[in-house]
Regions:
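PRPP-associated nucleotide enzymes
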Residues: 1-139
Length: 139
């Protein structure tokens, strides 16, 4: 996975050198991509790298189609925002809140069933008798 990230992403020194950079990504799942991009930007001379994530922190497995079936592989489940910021070597890190996500898409989640289970652990269907059993699920 890290080699794939290395091959498809690079930073242009003439653009980022000496600058404060804000990197925006859709999510952080395992942390591999964010860590690598921050490193590329700093190696290219970025003065600071601030990371903003356009989803709430993914703390719970998704059983509805996304390939994250255990808590262990979800970095936001294992680390606080400050710890994750340090791990990816960013100067700052922030996630959009659940409420902020709803507002950004003009969505009333009370009236419609937007699945937020990977963010808050409230699954829309009863998959297992307990969350402990769900966490042992392996694809």
């Amino acid at each position: 996975r890290e080699q794939g990230v290395r091959m498809k992403l690079s930073a242009v020194s003439s653009i980022v050198s000496g600058k404060k950079v804000v990197m925006i990504d859709d999510s952080i799942v395992r942390g591999t991509t964010s860590k690598r991009i921050v490193r590329h930007l700093k190696d290219a001379g970025a003065k600071e790298v601030h990371v903003r994530i356009a989803s709430p922190a993914i703390k719970f497995p998704c059983f509805y189609g996304v390939d994250t079936s255990t808590l262990e592989e979800l970095i936001s489940n294992k680390m606080s925002v400050d710890e994750l910021c340090e791990y990816i070597e960013a100067d700052s890190l922030a996630f959009i809140s659940e409420e902020g996500l709803h507002k950004s898409i003009h969505f009333d989640h009370q009236k419609c069933g937007l699945c937020m289970s990977c963010f808050n652990g409230n699954y829309v269907t009863n998959l297992y008798d307990s969350f402990d059993k769900a966490n042992k699920f392996e694809k």
